[in-house]
Every structure is written in C-alpha cells, then in structure tokens.
Amino acid sequence: MTDQNRPEETQARAARFIRHLRESADTEDRPTVMVLAFEGWNDAGGAASSAVRSIATAAEAELAERIDDEDYYDYQFTRPRVRRNGPHREIVWPSTKVYRAQPESAEMNLLLVSGVEPSFRWQSFTAELLTRAAENDVSAIVLVGALLADVPHTRPIPSSLSSEDAALQEALDIDEPSYEGPTGIVGVLAHTADQAGIPAVSLWAAVPHYVGQAPSPKAQLALMRQLEDLLGLTLEVEEVAEDAEAWERGVDDLAQEDSDIAEYVQRLEEASDTPNLPEASGEAIAREFERYLRRRRPPEA
C-alpha cells in the first residue's frame, strides 16, 4: 500500500513532518531541521542534552561552529576547564556547539545544537542562533527539554510534543503549549522562532523529582524514542535502555530502604495508573513496533 493510500492516522509521524515541511517550502529537497538542547534549568537529570549528544554521535555529526561569545556566560557559574592536549595544556571555554549531520536513516538533514544555557543577553543569543538557522535554510526547529515532576520512576516517563504553529499542530496532531510561568532558554527560543516565521516543536520529558540528579537514562531514552518518531531516525538505544533498567533498579533499592519514600512512590503510581495512559494507546504501540522493525531491517547492499 502506498503512503498516499494509507489512512492519515496510521502514517508515521516523521512522514507527516517531512511532507509538511516540503509542502510549506514547495520543494522535494531534503529539509534541514535544527534540534537544540541546553544544560541547566531546562535539562533535569541531564536527559535532554544527553539525548541530543547521543543523536550527534549516532549520526556521526561533524562540528560546524561554536558560539562562545564571553558576553553570554558567567564564568563563576559555568567555569572554563583545563585539559591536557598532548604535551600542552589548554583552556576549554563554555560554548554552544553546532553540529551538522546527514543521517542515512532519515529524510532530512540535521543541525544539532548543544551547550550550556547562557547567563546573559538571551535576546542577542536567540537572535544569533536564529541567524544561523536562516543561513542554513532551516525549515523547522525542535527544542528538547526535561523538567522535574511528580511522576514515579517505576512507570514510563511522560513526554509531550507541542507547538505554537497552528499548521504544525494539525500536521503532527499535537497541542498548543499551555504553560504559563518562568521559562528557560528553550521556551524563549520556541516562542522567538515562531515569531520569526520558523515553525518550532517543543519536546519535554518529565523526570521524577525525587531522583532528579544526572544522569537520568530513563528520561533520556524517552526523549530519544520521541525524536526517532519525529525525525525518522533509527537509533541504537540498547545501551541507554540497559542503563535505564539499572537506574530503575537502583532507585528501587533506595526506596526500599526508606518506608516514607516507598509510600510516596506508591501514591505516585496509583495517581499515574489510569486507563488512558498515552503509553498504552494504539498509536504508541504501533510506533514502538515500527522502531523494532527498523532496527531489524538489514542494511541495503
């Protein structure tokens, strides 16, 4: 059955995303999507930045440029590091790195942006990043974040997609963001990109707040799977999945040693165990099966 003949609701999210970007640009060329994550306030458990770095490694991304203007960083908060490079020592300054990738498993090119949330001049920083996006003909931006929440570590990590762009909401069947309150650089970039005419998607995962320290491989895995579905990637997640299982066992052991924590986790489990969990939906199960088939598919000769 051809893609055109399949019901809309059964087509992969990545295919809908690609088609929307091509139709918007009136071209059949591979679109370029910028994916960003920042360490700091938007990155509970280091899950978002770890997910984007994992994609950069898997896609064999090459470093394209750095944004290291010292006006953006408070070096007492984000300190430079000293490291040895052969017989010499060097200073590594905080920066935002931009990587370029053309993953074979996807129908799009990627600009992967990873760094530390800047301390100062956010408006100038976002303007500089959006200038880089325009220079590279970026068709859409994906912002990746993780937040602390009242969720149990024993259940699937909740994750969500949203966009301020009405056309993307319809194409991807996602909601408009409803959050109001303090925001980080991820929220600023999502709104600024939309105002600049670059459609933006925000992807967030909820990290159990009682184990919010890094690493958080279970949340990282949830974000990587969402990015697989959205970008059409095929990622090797076995190592991260093993880390997630070990992490969950470790938290189980800690909870068993403290009756108050164990009781609290049980209350969170009861609150989350509803019949309408998105992880149990037909669409979620279908996406998981598609991932399984992609990983089993032999490479083309």
PLM regions: where:
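Internal, conserved structured core segments that host functional sites
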Residues: 108, 116-167, 189
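Flexible, glycine/proline-enriched loop segments at strand-loop-helix junctions
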Residues: 38-42, 112-122, 172-180, 210-214
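N-terminal short beta-loop-beta anion/metal-coordinating cradle
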Residues: 3-115
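Hydrophobic/aromatic beta-strand patches that form the interior of the parallel beta-sheet core
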Residues: 65, 111-113, 142, 199-204
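Catalytic cores of processing enzymes, dominated by hydrolases/peptidases
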Residues: 150-230, 234
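Conserved active-site and cofactor/substrate-binding residues in soluble primary-metabolism enzymes
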Residues: 46-50, 120, 124, 180, ...
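A conserved C-terminal secondary-structure "cap"
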Residues: 211-301
